[in-house]
Swiss-Prot record:
Ranges spanned by the short sequence motif Switch 1, renumbered to the chain: 30-42
One Gene Ontology molecular-function label: GTP binding
Role played: The small GTPases Rab are key regulators of intracellular membrane trafficking, from the formation of transport vesicles to their fusion with membranes. Rabs cycle between an inactive GDP-bound form and an active GTP-bound form that is able to recruit to membranes different set of downstream effectors directly responsible for vesicle formation, movement, tethering and fusion. Required for the integrity and for normal function of the Golgi apparatus and the trans-Golgi network. Plays a role in insulin-stimulated translocation of GLUT4 to the cell membrane.
Keywords from the UniProt entry: Cytoplasmic vesicle, Endosome, Golgi apparatus, GTP-binding, Hydrolase, Lipoprotein, Magnesium, Membrane, Metal-binding, Nucleotide-binding, Phosphoprotein, Prenylation
Regulation: Regulated by guanine nucleotide exchange factors (GEFs) including RIN3 and GAPVD1 which promote the exchange of bound GDP for free GTP. Regulated by GTPase activating proteins (GAPs) which increase the GTP hydrolysis activity. Inhibited by GDP dissociation inhibitors (GDIs) which prevent Rab-GDP dissociation.
Protein name in UniProt: Ras-related protein Rab-31
Gene name, Swiss-Prot/TrEMBL: Rab31
Organism: Mus musculus
Taxon lineage: Eukaryota, Metazoa, Chordata, Craniata, Vertebrata
Tissue spec. comment: Detected in brain astrocytes (at protein level).
Disulfide bonds: none
Residue positions of covalent lipid attachment, annotated as S-geranylgeranyl cysteine: 194-195
Domain statement: Switch 1, switch 2 and the interswitch regions are characteristic of Rab GTPases and mediate the interactions with Rab downstream effectors. The switch regions undergo conformational changes upon nucleotide binding which drive interaction with specific sets of effector proteins, with most effectors only binding to GTP-bound Rab.
E.C. number: 3.6.5.2
One Pfam family linked to the record: Ras
Record's bilayer topology term: Lipid-anchor
């Protein structure tokens, strides 16, 4: 029987870059042309095989609007990975991506896997962000970089497979461990002392 690992993943980025569309395409293999902006955050799951394990992605799709920015730490806290999404047709979204990366490095989990998704690659004829720039930036921060199209289902699976490959496998002693706090039995007598 394969071990199932739950991996919390959050999606960050400007409003309108396609975070929700990426999640819908990955989880439901569906694209909605009229998707509404996310309010706060939404949550979906999908389990995929990775080596001798199953990775159950617990995906938090965060709102991109500035007014919801202060909620983001609640979603990336404890995350195994973060997908920072930008729109290849909007240079501003790539600049905002760098702010998200800075915030993750300062306040996120120490060993978080970072993936950069340049979404809307189906619109490459109106591209503002060269892939070369994204690759150089990703390399400078040790992140995965993938250009995606949620609309045309390009590289969506590859994005999450790339994240899976970056997650270290469980060691033999960790199999079956939920990762929670271990409680041990200690003698109460030793701890009962008067001040």
């Amino acid at each position: 029987m394969m071990a199932i690992r739950e991996l919390k993943v959050c999606l960050l980025g400007d409003t309108g870059v396609g975070k929700s569309s990426i999640v819908c395409r990955f989880v439901q293999d569906h694209f909605d042309h009229n998707i509404s902006p996310t309010i706060g955050a939404s949550f979906m799951t999908k389990t995929v095989p990775c080596g001798n394990e199953l990775h159950k992605f617990l995906i938090w799709d965060t709102a991109g609007q500035e007014r919801f920015h202060s909620l983001a730490p609640m979603y990336y806290r404890g995350s195994a990975a973060a997908v920072i999404v930008y729109d290849i047709t909007k240079q501003d979204s790539f600049h905002t991506l760098k702010k998200w990366v800075k915030e993750l490095k300062e306040h996120g989990p120490e060993n978080i896997v970072m993936a950069i998704a340049g979404n809307k690659c189906d619109l490459s004829d109106i591209r503002e962000v060269p892939l070369k720039d994204a690759k150089e930036y990703a390399e400078s921060i040790g992140a995965i970089v993938v250009e995606t199209s949620a609309k045309n289902a390009i590289n969506i699976e590859e994005l999450f497979q790339g994240i899976s490959r970056q997650i270290p496998p469980l060691g033999p002693q960790e199999n079956g461990n939920s990762g929670g706090i271990k409680l041990g039995n200690q003698s109460l007598q030793a701890s009962r002392r008067c001040c």
